[in-house]
């Protein structure tokens, strides 16, 4: 399993903190996340380069 990510973890994009993610599942060599479009819609994204994902994503959701 990949260290540093867990199911239902809340993340945000470091370049744009308002872009929010929730970890859907952690696979052997990938992290699958929901990228939230608004409060109800999301898009599923899969990061296979986990070290790169750790550089892009920060812990938690910013206060609005």
UniProtKB/Swiss-Prot annotation:
Name listed for the protein in its UniProt record: SPbeta prophage-derived uncharacterized protein YosJ
> Which species does the entry assign this protein to?
Bacillus subtilis (strain 168)
Provide the gene name from the record.
Answer: yosJ
């Amino acid at each position: 399993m990949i260290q540093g990510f867990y199911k239902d973890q809340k993340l945000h994009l470091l370049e744009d903190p308002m872009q929010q993610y929730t970890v859907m599942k952690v696979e052997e060599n990938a992290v699958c996340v929901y990228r939230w479009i608004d409060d109800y819609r999301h898009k599923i994204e899969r990061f296979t380069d986990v070290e790169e994902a750790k550089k892009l994503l920060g812990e938690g959701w910013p206060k609005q």
